[in-house]
């Protein structure tokens, strides 16, 4: 029996060539406003599939278009340069750019790690994904939209952010060299917390970890039941200020961060067990928060 040497991809929606050839594109504007009419975000002349709703357009453009560091091109795809001969950088202006950086990066890593049986299968994988993304048959999570392909397609790097990855060539856990060559593409995290103020795994350390995840578009949740309740004794002789005081710090920090650097606020989940001494305070606070939200 022949040994399986990789994935074989059968085309269902595309044929060799341009995967977008049957898709109609149009230029649109995207504008996000507050209830009082003030403008949160606005971008004009963006290229979107004609079948997309305005809501889908606004989500794509305001949240998932990269807003800086992207080489600008003319209508023929040639890079634009300034008077010094440097490539002009700016935002993504077409959803094709987003679909391309996602599908081409996934194909690249698949080929790097030997996933495909042949180059033709890798190309079919890429083309099928581009078509399915453009026709809304498929969509990845937000961190993929935000981060995937920024290094592979545009050469973006940035300082290391404390992320680690398993090097496929060695099997070793390795610190990331920069922000985007091996980005953080996972959506949701559950993190633990120790009843400790400043040491690793403690309260303040959690806020740093949460900020790192929020910055790249992820959400996080934690059960805070390990923390002592208000008035419980501390080893230094004082008493704890309680869970609620620390939750307010975390809530303010999360509210100040734009998830993925866009208009989307960070997603955060707080859990407190029913038998925790501060559960009634937490319940009352949560009820008050809900009642203060607009209808």
What do these predicted ranges mean?
Residues 289-295:
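Positively charged, low-complexity/disordered segments
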Residues 1-284, 288:
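Extended catalytic cores of very large enzyme megasubunits
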């Amino acid at each position: 029996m022949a040994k399986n040497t990789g994935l074989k991809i059968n085309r269902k929606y595309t044929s060799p060539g341009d995967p977008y050839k049957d898709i109609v594109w149009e230029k649109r504007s995207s504008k996000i406003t507050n209830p009082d009419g003030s403008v949160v975000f606005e971008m004009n002349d963006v290229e979107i599939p004609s079948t997309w709703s305005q809501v889908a357009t606004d989500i794509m453009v305001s949240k998932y278009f990269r807003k800086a560091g992207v080489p600008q091109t003319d209508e023929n795809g040639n890079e634009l340069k300034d008077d010094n001969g440097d490539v002009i950088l700016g935002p993504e202006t077409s959803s094709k750019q987003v679909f391309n950086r996602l599908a081409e990066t996934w194909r690249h890593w698949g080929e790097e790690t030997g996933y495909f049986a042949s180059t033709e299968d890798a190309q079919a994988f890429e083309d099928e994904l581009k078509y399915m993304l453009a026709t809304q048959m498929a969509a990845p999570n937000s961190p993929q939209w935000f981060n995937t392909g920024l290094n592979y397609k545009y050469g973006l790097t940035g300082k290391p952010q404390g992320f680690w990855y398993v090097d496929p060539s060695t099997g070793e856990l390795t610190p990331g060299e920069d922000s985007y060559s091996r980005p953080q593409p996972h959506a949701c995290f559950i993190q633990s917390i120790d009843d400790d103020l400043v040491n690793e795994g403690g309260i303040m350390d959690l806020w740093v970890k949460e900020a790192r995840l929020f910055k790249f578009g992820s959400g996080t949740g934690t059960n805070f039941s390990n923390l002592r309740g208000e008035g419980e004794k501390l080893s230094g002789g004082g008493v704890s200020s309680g869970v609620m005081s620390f939750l307010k710090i975390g809530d303010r920090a999360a509210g100040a961060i734009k998830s993925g650097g866009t208009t989307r606020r960070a997603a955060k989940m707080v859990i407190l067990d029913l038998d925790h001494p501060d559960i009634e305070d937490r319940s009352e606070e949560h009820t008050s928060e809900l009642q203060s939200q607009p209808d």
